[in-house]
Amino acid sequence: MKYDVIGDIHGCYDEMIALIEKLGYSLTSGVPVHPENRTLVFLGDLTDRGPKSLEVVEFVGRAVEDGAVRYVPGNHCNKLYRFFKGNPVKLQHGLETTAAEYRNLPKQKQKDIRDLFMRLYEKAPLYEILHNGELVVAHAGIKAEDIGKKPVGKVKQFVLYGDITGETLPDGRPVRRDWAAHYRGEPWVVYGHTPVKNPRMIHHTINIDTGCVFGNRLTAFRFPELTTESVPSSLPYDESRFRMEP
């Protein structure tokens, strides 16, 4: 099996569709089908900040239930799940945009979207090991020694939030260690979470969150070819959102 892993979408539905079509998938059946039997994998953070978060949820949720694509959640997915469960969460860092979309829907549509997303999240693995162990997909990455472990405790925290130090930057974002610079595992780890201007490939890892929602690009990693494809964002570019790894 060959895979195309798509990075953080954050509600950029139009760019997602454009990238899927650029990768050679047909959408005539309503779900992505590739003539060479490739499979799409979504890297989490489907929603928040962008203009069409719930359209992304509908597309990915239905495609996963159809068996056409794979999905692992990100930290924004985790927070949206807690919001839909009725847990106390702060409507900030983009969740407020998804919540506004949701509240503008008719009641039945709200229920349908909520139920679809909750099924999607509850059935999803926190990280995926694919291609006979040669490819690992984890939203914020994973240490070599943790591949194969149950995603609980520190492993769960890592795959959702990265290698955080507990400290914060002046803008409130967490300080993260550059785990990829020290990765020495054999499997390729595909991750996102931290926006970078260009895909960062180092030591069998690649960060493909190229900040589509911040006006840059939406990127996919093709495996086993080890190549990338991307489409430009339609949103305004925000230089302040991009920083050097980690």
Curated annotation (Swiss-Prot):
Keyword Nucleotide-binding among UniProt keywords: yes
InterPro entries in the record: Ap4A_hydrolase (IPR050126), Bis(5'-nucleosyl)-tetraP_PrpE (IPR023937), Calcineurin-like_PHP_ApaH (IPR004843), Metallo-depent_PP-like (IPR029052), MPP_PrpE-like (IPR041780), Ser/Thr-sp_prot-phosphatase (IPR006186)
Molecular-function annotations in GO: bis(5'-nucleosyl)-tetraphosphatase (asymmetrical) activity; GTP binding; nickel cation binding; phosphatase activity
Catalytic activity: P(1),P(4)-bis(5'-guanosyl) tetraphosphate + H2O = GMP + GTP + 2 H(+)
Cofactor(s) needed for function: Ni(2+)
Residue intervals passing through the bilayer: none
Top-level taxon: Bacteria
Keyword entries, A-Z: GTP-binding, Hydrolase, Nickel, Nucleotide-binding
Keyword Cytoplasm among record annotations: no
Family: Belongs to the PrpE family.
Protein known as: Bis(5'-nucleosyl)-tetraphosphatase PrpE [asymmetrical]
